[in-house]
């Protein structure tokens, strides 16, 4: 590779210099072909300019021959050096010629009038090739015209004139002052490395990535929520989560199944006077009481208890069988009654009013649990508890067994001491998040999230409701950044935050792998469309799903292109050829082009604006983010 680099720089310089020197005196040979004095003079003039024009042509040919190379910028610098050497030789030759008779120039006449026009023409050709070489050296392969249809705008745009948002409009819409990092302000498809696939371990494929200004969202328009769609291995964490965690200045809640974000941003956010809390089943010493917010700041205890029970029970946005729905609803009511008994009956100490205690009360043999329910009905101080328990006091054993099995199954993760400690601890309270000085990183790995989604739902739901119940009386805004959010299943509180979160200081940014994941979670096409209508911005990157690619293509719109059509006809008398131009409709970007986009490129949609095609802010390409991000910290240093 080093030899190739040296060759690309040295070869054009050597070829151009040898051409200029080797073709010296060619004007004498050319002039012999003339039959008259005027012809011989003209050929002699051409011969003087010919070496320089030939050298310029060599530079251009060399650049076009190198087009598509990953290191074409080196060829550009080499051709530029060769052009400079050619102009220097022309200047020295002309200067020595003029110096020979400079003393004989008549008074009042400039020596510039004696400049050789043929030499000037040759030097100008070298200058033009040098300018093109400089362009190639600066922008690489983007200096060459792309083979694409000519787009028509204005009155002739019969089929539409959809176009990409320009970078100036993007800078106004997503200013650098925002806290949620969207991407980088440059067109990847017009970069010098656009023809090559992005490789994280090969800086030569990065192009302008990492050096361009950031595009950031400040929550100033729309609902303030964002959705990111990126396929598996699509740099979701490195391009969205980590950059935002480094730049966001308010309260932050991150669901991070990769467990990579907190170690990277820990020191940076700590230096910004943030209190960092990391909820990790591997380190259960850090936890909070998921019931400590119940009944506070305007919400009734009964409503809040029902909300907690709904997070524990898995739900679906789609249709369910009647039998399944009955047992689930009954189990939900039983769980609500047991949580209410712990919080409202008055026989449980304040420090024991936790989900761990709820599970302990539930995880009893059926006969003993039925006795407990009878005792709760007889002795509880809360009418709400009695009314919810009443249905189970005289329930038939067969039906109660089905209800009991559902309730035990949905709460079995509370039997794990490390899981229960996360939502039954006392390290911090939900008030700390609402105060705006605390960040929470939920480090639940993908396997745990898949099998015990209720754990993450309870944590996220508690934080959301703790802020929601304050009716906007929070410091700044709290950003909930949820990776692999499809694993949580259906959560009604997320829909509430989607529709009314802006008023209460809640911002959501959710990451899915495809549109199909969202539709599966929320029950079909119509339910998922509500999220598209409510989101301030939607990003698509590293798409591998044809359905998602088709959606992107349709949403970008149609454009009008001009097509050259050539028809040939052959007859006995000869052949004829007819050439015509016609207008045709073409998507701004076709589905197969979406699937072939580089991994560091994305398309961002916002309401009322043209689609934005830009780069992604992959943190390890940016020196400013590498200076802020650190190496993973030790497991013992989790809380500050």
From Swiss-Prot:
Q: How does it sit in the membrane?
A: Multi-pass membrane protein
SUPFAM superfamilies, A to Z = P-loop containing nucleoside triphosphate hydrolases
* Family, per entry: Belongs to the VirD4/TraG family.
Residues that span the membrane, as ranges: 6-26, 46-66, 70-90, 120-140, 215-235
Keyword list, A-Z: Cell membrane, Conjugation, Membrane, Plasmid, Transmembrane, Transmembrane helix
Name the chain's protein.
Probable conjugal transfer protein TraG
**Organism encoding this protein:** Sinorhizobium fredii (strain NBRC 101917 / NGR234)
Q: What is its main location?
A: membrane
Subcellular localization(s) per the UniProt record: Cell membrane
């Amino acid at each position: 590779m080093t030899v190739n680099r040296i060759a690309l720089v040295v070869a054009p310089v050597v070829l151009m210099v040898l051409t200029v020197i080797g073709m010296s005196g060619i004007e004498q040979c050319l002039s012999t072909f003339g039959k008259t004095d005027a012809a011989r003079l003209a050929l002699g003039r051409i011969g003087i300019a010919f070496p320089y024009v030939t050298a310029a042509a060599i530079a251009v040919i060399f650049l076009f021959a190198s087009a598509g190379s990953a290191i074409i910028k080196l060829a550009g610098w080499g051709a530029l050096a060769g052009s400079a050497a050619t102009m220097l030789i022309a200047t020295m030759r002309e200067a020595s010629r003029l110096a020979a008779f400079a003393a004989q120039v008549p008074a009042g006449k400039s020596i510039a009038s004696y400049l050789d026009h043929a030499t000037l023409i040759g030097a100008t050709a070298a200058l033009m090739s040098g300018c093109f070489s400089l362009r190639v050296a600066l922008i690489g392969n983007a200096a060459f015209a792309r083979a694409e249809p000519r787009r028509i705008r204005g009155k002739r745009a019969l089929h539409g004139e959809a176009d990409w948002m320009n970078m100036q409009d993007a800078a106004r819409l997503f200013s650098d002052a925002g806290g949620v990092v969207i991407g980088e302000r440059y067109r990847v498809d017009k970069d010098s490395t656009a023809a090559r696939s992005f490789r994280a371990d090969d800086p030569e494929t990065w192009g302008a990535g990492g050096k361009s200004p950031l595009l950031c969202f400040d929550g100033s328009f729309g609902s303030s929520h964002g959705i990111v769609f990126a396929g598996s291995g699509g740099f979701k964490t490195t391009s969205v989560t980590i950059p935002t965690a480094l730049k966001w200045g308010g309260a932050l809640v991150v669901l991070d199944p990769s467990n990579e974000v907190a170690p990277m941003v820990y020191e940076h956010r700590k230096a910004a006077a943030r209190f960092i809390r990391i909820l990790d089943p591997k380190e259960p010493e850090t936890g909070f009481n998921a019931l400590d917010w119940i009944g506070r700041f305007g919400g009734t205890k009964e409503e809040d208890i029902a909300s907690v029970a709904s997070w524990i029970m898995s739900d679906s946005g789609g249709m369910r069988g009647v039998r399944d729905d009955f047992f689930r609803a009954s189990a939900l009511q039983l769980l609500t009654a047991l949580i209410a008994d712990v919080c409202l009956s008055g026989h449980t100490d304040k420090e024991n009013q936790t989900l761990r205690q709820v599970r302990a009360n539930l995880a009893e043999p059926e006969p003993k649990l039925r006795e407990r329910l009878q005792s709760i009905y007889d002795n509880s101080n809360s009418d709400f508890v009695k009314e919810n328990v009443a249905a189970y006091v005289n329930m038939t054993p067969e039906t109660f067994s089905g209800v009991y099995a559902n309730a035990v199954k949905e709460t079995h993760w509370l039997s794990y001491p490390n899981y229960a400690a996360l939502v039954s601890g006392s390290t911090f309270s939900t008030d700390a998040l609402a105060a705006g000085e605390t960040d929470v990183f939920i480090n639940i790995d993908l396997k745990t999230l898949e099998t015990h989604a209720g754990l993450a739902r309870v944590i996220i739901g508690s934080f959301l409701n703790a802020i929601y119940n304050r009716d906007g009386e929070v410091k700044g805004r709290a950003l909930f950044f949820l990776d692999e959010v499809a694993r949580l299943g259906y959560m009604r509180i997320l829909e509430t935050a989607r529709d009314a979160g802006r008023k209460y200081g809640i911002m959501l940014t959710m990451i899915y792998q495809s549109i199909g994941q969202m539709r599966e979670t929320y029950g079909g096409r119509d339910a998922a469309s509500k999220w598209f209508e409510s989101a301030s911005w939607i990003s698509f990157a590293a798409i591998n799903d044809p359905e998602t690619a088709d959606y992107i293509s349709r949403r970008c719109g149609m454009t009008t292109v001009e097509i050259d059509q050539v028809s040939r006809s052959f007859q006995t008398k000869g052949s004829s050829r007819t050439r015509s131009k016609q207008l045709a409709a073409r998507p701004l970007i076709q589905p197969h082009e979406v699937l072939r986009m580089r991994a560091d490129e994305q398309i961002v949609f916002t309401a009322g604006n043209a689609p934005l095609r830009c780069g992604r802010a992959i943190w390890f390409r940016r020196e400013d983010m590498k200076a802020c991000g650190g190496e993973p910290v030790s497991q013992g240093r989790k809380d500050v």
